Amino acid sequence: MTKDFYRQLDPVEEKIVPPENAIVISSEAKEATVNEKEAKQGVLSQRVMKYIGENELVDGISVRDPDYLKRFFNERRKQFSAKWDKVTNKIDDIAGRYYAREESFTSTIASLHTDPNERLIPGLLSILVASMTGSVLARRRTWLLRATMPIILGSCCFAYAMPTTFRNTMGLIHNLEMNTFPHFTERQDRVWKETKRLSTASVQYYYDAKKWLNKDVEKTGNAIKNWTGVNVK
């Protein structure tokens, strides 16, 4: 006769649950408890129990947890947790520095081109053409001209085509120089200020001399006119 797997199940008949009036005595698991005295005397079962741990009933289930295994996994878990925290902190630190640099870079690039009237793509193409022109013009010259002429023409075109962006770029380069080479930048600033002062003074001297010369020429012309009646102006 085949077994009917779909029969009506009686838990008591199948001994799944005890009868209603039955008395169930829970085992204290004394037979699985380590006896230190017998373990020291070399009783095999007690030595085995010492390694597999004492038996404990947890919700009616026999559980063994040796102390050395608990210590082992506790130490390994702590080591893994410490290493994991160290790795995650390192990753967070690297990611934070990367995002900070990315934000600094994007904000710096955005701060360079601030004038909407300056068309970026045509300006960059003009700078490229000017640099290539300088390279072509200095192709058969000395190495110094070949190295500097593209930079000079490109910079001049940059300052002419996009003056606001050029000033912002020069300010950025100056800040980078100040952070990297502060002493050199200070000397460079002093030289630049002195050069500007001399240039301004030279222009002023030129206009003063021109004004003085025009005044003297005018006086001389008036004197000749008064003496001879000839207009020499």
From Swiss-Prot:
Keywords linked to the UniProt accession: Membrane, Mitochondrion, Mitochondrion inner membrane, Transmembrane, Transmembrane helix
Transmembrane segments: 120-137, 142-164
Entry's localization field: Mitochondrion inner membrane
Signal peptide limits: none
Predominant cellular place of this UniProt entry's protein: mitochondrion
Annotated membrane topology: Multi-pass membrane protein
GO terms under cellular component: MICOS complex; mitochondrial crista junction; mitochondrial inner membrane; mitochondrion
Spans within the Mitochondrial intermembrane topological domain: 1-119, 165-233
Misc note: Present with 5220 molecules/cell in log phase SD medium.
Family label: Belongs to the apolipoprotein O/MICOS complex subunit Mic27 family. Yeast Mic26 subfamily.
Protein name, UniProt field: MICOS subunit MIC26
Annotated organism of origin: Saccharomyces cerevisiae (strain ATCC 204508 / S288c)
